[in-house]
């Protein structure tokens, strides 16, 4: 009898290098205890929970009772599509958990502090006849029993979806552009985009990175512009704030080779700001920017 050993490959623990750690010194969200106590009793879908938490962070996270946002801002926070965000916000507003008022291209959203108005349970999904009170069945479709017919129907649906995919993509893009007329650069799906000023800021950072690392690859300007937009819309940083902090980092003996994109700048923003305010040591690469001369901002800040 031979001795054998079974080798079990456990899944690797996924760790992000330089992962983020929660720290109260970086800020916290102040929410009334009454709201926190009532939240566990809410019967919400996953998407509704995501959007509800996003509304809480966009308001109470910034010590505000309400905020002006677009569906895209919440979509970026939650990873949901604009349509799913719109549906979830509508459901939350109908149940009086939040208030949502359309204002031009934006929405004013906030948590409804009248907790007695909250509808804790999900509404019934079945439609009822006015007089009899009878509900429609959940599914009025009777599927065929034969395998051949089912297979045929399935393939017909696939062909139909394939034929209409281009049309729906064009429709989504047109809808995106009508909702975000300021978009100067964007992906075909509209998931990533930026304004003309966001693009100029991204180009300016790219030109500075090129001075530090001349052999670096050309960046994806749509992705960089999108990150600049997120810093502006979600983090409340102005283009001038972004350029000024990157200028400081690009001259610092350590950060100049570690902050080479808007993404890394955003990730290390708080740490960079603290070091800059504390007068951290820095070493200039090239004296390209003089804070006493605002000509450096021409074309970036308008």
From Swiss-Prot:
Residues 1-20, 152-172 are annotated as: Disordered. Keywords: DNA replication, DNA-binding, Early protein. InterPro entries: Phage_lambda_VrpO_N, WH-like_DNA-bd_sf. Coiled coil: none annotated. Transmembrane segments: none annotated. One of its GO terms (molecular function) is DNA binding. GO terms for biological process: DNA replication. Residues 71-90 bind DNA. It comes from the Viruses. Residues 1-15 have a biased composition (Polar residues). Residues 152-163 have a biased composition (Low complexity). Belongs to the phage O protein family. This protein is essential for phi-80 DNA synthesis. Presumably, its N-terminal half determines specific interaction with the replication origin on the phage DNA, while its C-terminal half binds specifically to the gene 14 protein. This is Replication protein 15. It comes from Enterobacteria phage phi80.
């Amino acid at each position: 009898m031979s001795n054998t050993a079974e080798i079990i490959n456990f899944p690797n623990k996924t760790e992000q290098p330089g992962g983020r750690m929660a720290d109260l010194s970086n800020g916290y969200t102040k929410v009334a205890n009454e709201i926190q106590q009532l939240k566990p009793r809410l019967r919400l879908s996953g998407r509704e929970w995501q959007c509800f938490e996003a509304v809480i962070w966009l308001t109470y996270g910034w010590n505000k009772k309400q905020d002006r946002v677009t569906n895209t801002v919440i979509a970026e926070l939650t990873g949901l599509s604009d349509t799913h965000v719109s549906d979830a916000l509508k459901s939350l507003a109908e149940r009086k958990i939040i208030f949502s008022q359309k204002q031009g291209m934006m929405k004013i959203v906030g948590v409804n502090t009248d907790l007695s108005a909250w509808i804790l349970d999900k509404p019934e999904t079945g439609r009822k006849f006015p007089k009899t009170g009878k509900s429609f069945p959940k599914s009025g479709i009777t599927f065929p029993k034969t395998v051949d017919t089912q297979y045929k129907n399935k393939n017909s649906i696939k062909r139909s979806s394939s034929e209409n995919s281009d049309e729906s993509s064009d429709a989504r893009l047109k809808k995106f552009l009508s909702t975000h007329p300021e978009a100067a650069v964007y992906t075909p799906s509209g998931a990533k985009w930026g304004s003309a000023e966001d693009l100029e800021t991204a180009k300016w950072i790219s030109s500075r990175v090129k001075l530090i690392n001349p052999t670096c690859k050309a960046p994806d300007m749509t992705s960089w512009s999108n990150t600049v937009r997120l810093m502006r819309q979600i983090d409340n940083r102005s283009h001038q704030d972004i350029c000024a902090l990157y200028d400081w980092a690009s001259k610092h003996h350590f950060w100049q080779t570690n902050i080479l994109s808007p993404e890394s700048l955003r990730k290390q923003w708080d740490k960079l700001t603290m070091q800059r305010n504390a007068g951290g040591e820095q070493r200039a690469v090239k004296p390209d920017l003089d804070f006493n001369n605002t000509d450096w901002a021409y074309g970036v800040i308008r």
